[in-house]
Swiss-Prot record:
The lineage of its organism: Bacteria, Bacillati, Cyanobacteriota, Cyanophyceae, Oscillatoriophycideae. GO terms for biological process: photosynthesis. Disulfide bonds: none annotated. Its main location: membrane. It is found in: Cellular thylakoid membrane. GO terms for cellular component: photosystem II oxygen evolving complex; plasma membrane-derived thylakoid membrane. The keyword Membrane applies. The keyword Membrane applies. This is Photosystem II reaction center Psb28 protein. Keywords: Membrane, Photosynthesis, Photosystem II, Thylakoid. NCBIfam families: PS_II_psb28 (TIGR03047). It is a peripheral membrane protein. HAMAP family: PSII_Psb28 (MF_01370). Pfam families: Psb28 (PF03912).
Amino acid sequence: MTTIQFIQGIDEEVTPEVRLTRSRSGNQGTATLIFEDPKALGQDVTQEITGMYMIDEEGQITSRDVKARFVNGQPKFLEGLYVMKTKQEWERFMRFMESYAKEHDLGFKKAKA
């Protein structure tokens, strides 16, 4: 099963908006995953958010760069940033996203240039 967690052991049920950037050389890139009203920010959750864990059959990709965005003083969004510094990290992330998209019936839309 392919899943994303903010608290290890608790799968996030909200589907994120994913934004990708890539350097001209193709060797570096970033992925920003934005979750609106995620389970991890629910009132019944008492555990601490320790990172963003992207888990699939190959293993786990981890990012510690997670921020909450607030609306009217209440947590509304979680934003995870994953920085890819090599072509291998980019390819690994893309394999994760392919698997995640397939399991969650998601599509891919290329940005307009």
